[in-house]
Amino acid sequence: MITLRKLPLAVAVAAGVMSAQAMAVDFHGYARSGIGWTGSGGEQQCFQATGAQSKYRLGNECETYAELKLGQEVWKEGDKSFYFDTNVAYSVAQQNDWEATDPAFREANVQGKNLIDWLPGSTIWAGKRFYQRHDVHMIDFYYWDISGPGAGIENIDLGFGKLSLAATRSQEAGGSYTFSSQDIYNSSKDTANDVFDVRLAGLETNPDGVLELGVDYGRANTTDDYRLADGASKDGWMFTAEHTQSMLKGYNKFVVQYATDAMTTQGKGIPQGSYGSTFDIGEGDDQLHYVDRYVNNNGKLWRILDHGAISLGDRWDLMYVGMFQKQDLDNDLGTDWWTVGVRPMFKWTPIMSTLLEVGYDNVKSQQTGDRNNQYKITLAQQWQAGDSIWSRPAIRLFATYAKWDEKWGYIKDGDNTLRYAASNNSGFNTTSRGDNDEWSFGAQMEIWW
């Protein structure tokens, strides 16, 4: 029996328990780590074609990486709520027991849901955020990603689709110059690159098929009394259309993208090009001289991409990707990049499987006309928490073989790697790996939760 003297304490404890349940902290994240060796000796090597923006990742990741997310719904009244989300990332070379590293503070934002009565279902947000990212998992390639500090409103229900509006920022070192400052130490400063993003998603096109359309505008935002270097890329556009088809207990995504000028460098919705590095050939000495100045990214980029993950029965799952990307720049520093790959999975039991990943990359230099190509094959035996190709955590043993033939590379000037390309027989020191092959083997864990 609870006496009156004990009643206030019991009420306080009960209120505390209920509050703790209502305000529970969400813990999410991602991590991978392992150990590997190379056939020719030494630690594990990873293989990526020169000029390609990504690599086939199964049995081909040489670092320990983790993202730790803590979040909490801090207030809720009816269907209205505020949610606070954070994310800190770490990456080390997995070479020692003690590897110190500075964390990357990747997310810190607040999301308010259903706060605007005349826009039910919408969310307003502000802060650093991973914003509606689109990627190909098997090559770890983000083709639409404007993440960064920003603000916006998303999931506005229009009846036929959902509209999202956002603005984010990505800082670019250097690029803004002034000649009016009396302080020589303030003669240049970093350039703030702004992105304005509009997306319309959930457009029903056919049974189990939806379309998403997006427009991104990026620009270099200079401070008063500063100006961009002459000829620097000041702004650009990116247009995206993505069709998602639900099929075979999975999906297929077909994507078409077009970008101009400052949006061509990364090709994912973040502007670059107001600053960079290049080189000059000295008159009379034919020597390479490193010059710290802008890089002009004026031009265009086309990308056609198809990727997906499907089930082919009780025992088989499959991931796949095929992509062509053409970066056609006015200064001839672009590339043509072809990539195609598959990752079938055979399930021996609900928790044990064998995976085979085969990937091929071909990259043509716009400047030299030469091509780099690489194919990579990985066989892995895996134990995972479930019978899906997406099931994690997973522990895998792997063996990887890569064969490449590279005819060009980016010019190296000491410790600097420049955007200019040169053929292997040009006489310049380049990043080209030549014609060779290698194999590696090891063990890795991967988890997300």
From Swiss-Prot:
The record marks Y30, Y65, W98, Y251, W390, W448 as: Greasy slide, important in sugar transport. GO terms for molecular function: maltodextrin transmembrane transporter activity; maltose transporting porin activity. The keyword Coiled coil does not apply. InterPro entries: G_neg_Bact_CarbUptk_Porin, Maltoporin, Porin_LamB, Porin_LamB_sf. The record marks Y142 as: Important in sugar transport. It is a multi-pass membrane protein. It holds the Pfam family LamB. Homotrimer formed of three 18-stranded antiparallel beta-barrels, containing three independent channels. Involved in the transport of maltose and maltodextrins. One of its GO terms (cellular component) is cell outer membrane. Induction: By maltose. Disulfide bonds: none annotated. It comes from the Bacteria. Belongs to the porin LamB (TC 1.B.3) family. Residues 1-24 form the signal peptide. This is Maltoporin. The keyword Ion transport applies. Keywords: Cell outer membrane, Ion transport, Membrane, Porin, Signal, Sugar transport, Transmembrane, Transmembrane beta strand, Transport. It is found in: Cell outer membrane. It catalyses: beta-maltose(in) = beta-maltose(out). The gene is lamB. One of its GO terms (biological process) is monoatomic ion transport.
